[in-house]
Amino acid sequence: MNSVEKSLNTVADTAEIAPNNDFWARIASHVVADPDYQNRVYADWTASGRLFKPIEDRISNMVGGLMANTHTEDSYTGRVMTTWLHEAEQVIKQHVNASSEDILLNVGSGMTGALAKLIRMMGWWCHEQHRSIVLENMGQKPLVYITHREHHSNHTMWIESLVELRIIPALEGDEIDLEWLEKDLFNEKNRKIKMASITAASNVTGIETPYRRIAKIMHEHKAYCFVDFAASAPYVDIDMHPNDEEWLDAIFFSPHKFLGGPGSSGVLIFNKALYQNKVPEQPGGGTVLWTNPWGEHRFISNIEQRESGGTPGILQTIKTAMAVQLKEEMGTKNIYEREQYLNALLFNRIDKIDGVRVLSDNHKHRLSIFSIVFENVDYKTAVQRLSNDFHVETRGGCACAGTYGHHLLNIDYCTSKSITDQLDDEFQSLKPGWVRVSLHPCMSESEINTIADAIENVANGANAMFAAPEKTQSIWAPLI
């Protein structure tokens, strides 16, 4: 039984959990909402979290007044900001049970930048102009395994890197064929570099990947295991070192998906044994111990410093740590129980709506992510109607998971080729997809019913409940 199934076995069990409405209502009261449309329901949490007023206030009122660059401890403001930055880094490391051998880098704007950084540091990337030359001379490629559930950032990035990529086959019921993985690893026992780069949970269905078992399998075959926590990090425990067999060699996630997290950087944490570089991937200010006019220089030995060239994301890292702190104060046990309670409410409502189905609905225990297909309404129209006519914010498309979409929608090669040929000709309306609804534990039962009512109204072609929104007020009015 995996961690998403650890305490509940049926939806009926879930519905009996005390909802603890007062606690979650208090959390919700601090979420920054649309001032013009207070009744608008945000159900796109897997794409982005929302701002949390106590965090915004603390950054503005406490951090803002002392804002300064780091890279110095001689001045008071420089010393304070450097201290706060290091404290924030420790909060993040402790949250994932990183060891003293693990390196933390805050990179880009999400896990995409974090994974790109890892691939470049490992030397598995080059510019397309040089790709053919490099491949001709590099010898045996590293071998990378991914699952059929990956989103594009953990798929196409590997396709375009200097590795051989294999997708672990899917089994019936949307499961993952781990026996195939073990057999393939055995057959590749002479391959020098092997790794799995896998999602902890799907951003399409919310189904958890058995990444602990995969980590153990990979390590038994002297291979690495990298885990993408982009969809699940705001809601689940993350432990890089649970035991000697299931440790994680690298993890990456997107703190902007946390409540309170928008405006943060991507997070990459990896074991320093992976790092063999003499030259940082991005040389710059803060990476050198000294330089001189004759082209000589020496890089700092500390990996975290030498791989964080230029001014670090100071506010971004502090915000990440505060979002992590908020998650810990909410508690993953509370989050899990609330998720399953809200999931049961929404599943029970959707199951009764004709012309609507949830993808992989056999997996009831999941993160609060529902990808919905309307029989008689295309996903783009459905999302527009949900937003404009019923004030429910969702997301349409393939959720940047086209390969998984082929599996979920049973698209064979011939059908896929017909579609992609037309997409190449810019007929974007033919692109298959779904409507993704994603929830947060701080949402109320009333909001879940509003979402379900809106889905039913769209499926039935009901009239709009609200007038189309007016043009958004410009944020670029004069500031002074």
Give the label of every model feature segment.
Residues 1-480:
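Pyridoxal 5′-phosphate
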